[in-house]
Regions:
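Extreme N-terminal basic, low-complexity initiation segments
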Residues: 1-15
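Short hydrophobic alpha-helical segments enriched in small aliphatic residues
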Residues: 11, 21, 29-31, 37
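C-terminal beta-strand-loop-alpha-helix "lid" module of Rossmann-like NAD(P)-dependent dehydrogenases
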Residues: 36-341
Length: 341
């Protein structure tokens, strides 16, 4: 009984106490007490394993709670960016109506500026945050593949990135980002960054004679799915302008303007370029959150599977521990009964 009290009061020294207690017992008691000592030793080990499993289960539950929070945030962001995309399309319609008025009297044979040399400026939209699956890898591979198909030599490519996470994937493809912009999700920050990007594109055109500007970004399809997309920003599409010129005005009132045609045209084109950049970023952000939502759904499923495994292990081990305790009680009862006899 003295040996048992020592064992129960200090589980960390279970084996040591049991061993020396066993050596100090009379030879006649060895066989009987050895069984009890082994029982207490294994019970102590079982308790340690149970505590470890319980900590693992608690950690998995905390991780599951975090994943659920991120899923909720991603869903809210997808909805918000979707509403912004709808508003931007209305804004684009207003720009088109303005251009429609300006280009009505421009002759169809009017010349459009053509690229002076085979140089390309690429704007690649990535993410600032992680945990969004293969979002950045997909757009990086898509951009490089399309630039190769355009047959633009690597030395004639100038790449600008939005989002730090995509840079490493571009470098893995053997390219370098000369211009890098970081951005935040709030509206004022996005507007400021887009103005800086537009200014940099104008510098490309004026100083480096880069007249071909292409945007690469992921755009949402439905739910948590998206696809990579390429938009040729410059030079402006001649057929698009001719289509606007031939388009029938919806209202009976004939529109007009008072300011200089060239100034108005330049202002509208700048608004169109800004809109295209802004829309690309918003659709990229919506796609990023769609990718993050899909990643969190997979993570939640994996966590739930892991939790089920841990719970089964915990319950089985707990049942084994209870069985051992019951067996010890039965053994003790039998020993006392035999002693009385």
């Amino acid at each position: 009984m003295e040996a048992r009290n020592i064992i129960l009061s200090d589980e960390s020294r279970t084996f040591e106490v049991c061993f020396y207690t066993f050596l100090s017992l009379p030879a006649s008691a060895h066989a009987k007490d050895k069984k009890h000592i082994n029982t207490y030793y294994y019970q102590g080990k079982k308790m340690e394993q149970l505590e470890m499993l319980k900590r693992k289960i608690d950690n998995e539950n905390e991780l599951k709670s975090l994943v659920r929070t991120m899923k909720t945030l991603a869903s809210v962001s997808i909805r918000e960016y979707g509403q912004m995309v709808g508003s931007l399309h209305e804004y684009h319609k207003a720009i088109e109506m303005g251009l429609e008025v300006v280009v009505k009297n421009i002759p169809e044979e009017a010349e459009f500026a053509q690229p002076k040399k085979n140089c390309l400026g690429a704007v690649i939209f990535g993410s600032e945050q992680g945990m969004c699956g293969r979002f950045n890898e997909i757009i990086a591979k898509f951009a490089i593949k399309n630039m190769d198909e355009l047959e633009i030599l690597k030395e004639n490519r100038t790449i600008m990135t939005l989002g730090d996470r995509v840079i490493s994937h571009i470098e893995e493809e053997g390219e370098t980002a000369e211009e890098r912009f970081s951005y935040h999700g709030n509206q004022s920050g996005v507007t400021q960054i887009m103005l800086q990007v537009l200014t940099k594109i104008e510098e490309w055109r004026m100083q480096s004679e880069i007249d071909q500007i292409v945007l690469f970004y992921n755009m949402p399809v439905s739910g948590s799915s998206y696809r990579p997309h390429m938009l040729r920003l410059l030079p402006l599409d001649r057929e698009w302008f001719q289509g606007l010129a031939r388009k029938k005005w919806e209202s009976r009132s004939i529109p007009t303007f008072t300011m200089d045609r060239d100034d108005l045209f330049s202002s509208l084109i700048r608004q169109y370029l800004f809109f295209s950049l802004y829309l690309a970023l918003i659709e990229s952000l919506a796609s990023e959150n769609a990718s993050r939502l899909a990643s969190m759904q997979k993570a939640e499923k994996n966590i739930e599977e892991r939790l089920n495994e841990l719970r089964i292990q915990y319950h089985n081990m707990r049942q084994d521990s209870i069985t051992m305790e019951l067996m010890d009680v039965v053994t003790g009862f039998e020993a006392l009964t035999n002693k009385k006899r």
